UniProtKB/Swiss-Prot annotation:
Protein keywords: Membrane, Peroxisome, Phosphoprotein, Transmembrane, Transmembrane helix
Residues on Peroxisomal side: 112-175
One BP annotation, GO: regulation of peroxisome organization
Principal location class: membrane
Organism of origin: Saccharomyces cerevisiae (strain ATCC 204508 / S288c) (Baker's yeast)
Disordered, as annotated region: 1-26, 406-425
General remark: Present with 238 molecules/cell in log phase SD medium.
Entry protein name: Peroxisomal membrane protein PEX31
UniProt xrefs under PANTHER family: PEROXISOMAL MEMBRANE PROTEIN PEX30-RELATED
Transmembrane stretches, start-end: 91-111, 176-196
Length: 462
C-alpha cells in the first residue's frame, strides 16, 4: 500500500520539474556561439544544454533573454574599463593603448594622408580579434551567474572612472565653468605661443589614461602634500578638492577646546606650558564585490572608505597629517606609526596575554563584519557578510603656551552666522579642506592628563 501511495503522490513533483525544464530549455544554451540572425526563434529552437544557472528558475524569460543579448557588449566594456582603471593583469595592454593614443594624436594628419585606406582594414581586423575574444569568454563562462558577475564588475569600474566627476555638485560645475571662462586668455596664450592644441590634447589624454595607475596615484599623493600644489589646483579649477589637509578645520576646533581647557585648569599664569595627549582613531571600511572580493570601493550613497567615528569622510593614514605650529599650539605624533586596534574598540574579545594593537597587520585582521546594510555585526566572516570595518589608532600630543586669556566663543548658530558674514567681507580667497561637522578625540588610557572632546561645532572659516 505504501508503494502505491508514493506512486500516486510523486507525479505532481515530477510534473512541476518537467514544466520548469520545458520553460528553461530555450535559454539554457543562450550563451553558446551562434550563427545567423539572433532572434526569439533561435532561443526556442536551441535544445543543447551547456551550463544552466540556478537563477534561471527565478529569472523571467524576457530578462534572461535581454541579459544574454547584452553579455557580449558587457565583456567588451569590462575589458575596456579594465584598461582605463589599470585593474587588468596584463599591463602591456595599457602601455600599448598609451603608445597608440600618443601616435594617433601626434601624427594623425600624416597617418590619415598616407595610411587612411589601411586604417579601415586595421579597424576590421581589431573588430575580429575582439569578437574572437568575446566568443572565447562566453564559451568559458556560459552561465547567468557569469553575466551577473560581469555586470557587477562593469558597475564598479564605471563608478571608479566617474568618481572624479560624480562628486561634483551643480554649484561646483558652475564655479568650474566660471573659473575656466575667466582663464580663457591664458588658454589662448598657451595654444598660440607655447603648446599647440595637439599637445594639450595629448597631455589631457595621457592624464586620463594613467589616472588610475599605481605610479600616478602615488605621484599625486606625494605632490598633494605640498600646499603650493593644492593652491595651484584651487586657483585653476576654483574647486575645493580636499586632500591631506582636509582635517584642518577639525584641528582648528580642537585647538579652541584645548585653549579653553588649559585656561580653566592653570588659571592666569603667564608662559604656562601644558601638554595634552590625544588618541586619534580612523576607521577603514571595505565592501565585498562578487568575483573580486574585499575592496575599498564603496557604493556612492554609503560611507567613504576611510571615516572617523561619526562617519565623516577622513583621509587615509598615509596622508593624515597634524597641523603646523600656530597660535601657541604645537602638534606632534607621540606614536611612531599607526596601529591596528585588534579589539576594534573592545568589540573583539582577545586573551589577556594577547597584544591589543599591531603595526603591520594582515589583510583580514581586526575586522568586524556586517551585512549589506551595515547591520548585524559579527567577528566572523560568513557568506551573508558584505561589509566590514576596522579601527586604526595613533597617539598625538599638543603643547600649549599662553600669555593672555584666550577668547573662546560659544558655538551658537547666530554667532557662527555673524562671524561668517564678517569673514566674507574681509577675507581673501583661500582654501578650506573639510566639511566635517563633529570632532571626537578618543582619550588615551595612559596616566597622562587627557581630554575628551565630542560634538564640537565647526567654525565657518579658519
Amino acid at each position: 500500500m505504501s508503494e502505491i501511495n508514493n506512486e500516486n503522490l510523486e507525479p505532481t513533483s515530477s510534473t512541476v520539474a518537467e514544466s520548469t525544464e520545458s520553460k528553461n530549455k530555450h535559454i539554457r544554451s543562450a550563451l553558446r556561439k551562434r550563427r545567423g540572425k539572433l532572434s526569439a526563434q533561435t532561443y526556442e529552437e536551441d535544445q543543447e544544454a551547456i551550463l544552466s544557472s540556478p537563477l534561471l528558475t527565478s529569472t523571467p524569460k524576457t530578462v534572461s533573454r535581454s541579459l544574454v543579448r547584452l553579455y557580449p557588449y558587457l565583456i567588451v566594456v569590462d575589458n575596456f574599463l579594465s584598461i582605463i582603471t589599470w585593474s587588468n593583469d596584463n599591463v602591456s595592454a595599457n602601455l600599448l593603448g598609451i603608445f597608440l593614443f600618443t601616435v594617433c594624436v601626434l601624427y594623425f594628419g600624416f597617418i590619415t594622408r598616407y595610411f587612411g585606406h589601411l586604417m579601415i582594414v586595421g579597424i576590421i581586423w581589431v573588430y575580429l580579434l575582439i569578437d574572437k575574444h568575446v566568443q572565447e569568454t562566453m564559451a568559458s563562462c556560459p552561465s547567468l551567474d557569469d553575466i551577473i558577475h560581469v555586470m557587477d564588475r562593469v558597475s564598479m569600474k564605471s563608478s571608479a572612472v566617474l568618481s572624479p566627476i560624480t562628486i561634483l555638485s551643480a554649484q561646483d560645475v558652475r564655479r568650474l565653468l566660471f573659473t575656466i571662462a575667466f582663464l580663457s586668455p591664458v588658454y589662448i596664450f598657451l595654444t598660440v605661443f607655447v603648446l599647440s592644441p595637439n599637445y594639450l590634447m595629448l597631455i589631457g589624454g595621457l592624464y586620463v589614461l594613467t589616472y588610475h595607475s599605481k605610479l600616478i596615484r602615488r605621484m599625486r599623493r606625494y605632490l598633494w602634500k605640498f600646499r603650493v600644489v593644492r593652491l595651484l589646483v584651487f586657483f585653476i579649477t576654483g574647486l575645493d578638492l580636499g586632500g591631506p589637509d582636509n582635517n584642518r578645520r577639525l584641528f582648528a576646533s580642537v585647538n579652541k577646546k584645548i585653549r579653553s581647557f588649559v585656561w580653566n585648569e592653570v588659571g592666569n599664569t603667564s608662559n604656562t606650558k601644558k601638554t595634552v595627549l590625544f588618541k586619534v582613531a580612523l576607521f577603514e571600511n571595505q565592501r565585498r564585490w562578487l568575483g573580486i572580493g574585499w575592496t575599498s570601493t564603496m557604493l556612492s550613497y554609503e560611507r567613504a572608505s576611510w571615516t572617523d567615528e561619526f562617519l565623516n569622510t577622513s583621509p587615509s593614514p598615509e596622508v593624515f597629517t597634524l597641523p603646523e605650529e600656530q597660535s601657541g599650539m604645537a602638534w606632534e605624533w607621540h606614536d611612531k606609526d599607526w596601529m591596528l586596534d585588534l579589539t576594534n574598540d573592545g568589540i573583539i574579545q582577545l586573551p589577556a596575554s594577547a597584544a591589543k594593537t599591531k603595526v603591520k597587520p594582515g589583510a583580514d585582521e581586526g575586522f568586524i563584519y556586517y551585512d549589506n546594510t551595515w547591520n548585524n555585526p559579527s567577528a566572523t566572516d560568513t557568506y551573508k557578510k558584505y561589509t566590514r570595518r576596522r579601527r586604526w589608532i595613533r597617539t598625538a600630543t599638543v603643547t600649549t603656551t599662553y600669555d593672555d586669556e584666550p577668547t573662546v566663543e560659544k558655538a551658537t548658530p547666530n554667532s557662527h552666522a555673524l562671524k561668517s558674514e564678517e569673514n566674507n567681507r574681509v577675507r581673501k580667497r583661500k582654501v578650506s579642506f573639510s566639511t566635517a561637522n563633529e570632532v571626537h578625540i578618543i582619550p588615551s588610557s595612559d596616566s597622562s592628563k587627557l581630554i575628551q572632546i565630542s560634538d564640537v561645532s565647526m567654525s565657518p572659516s579658519l
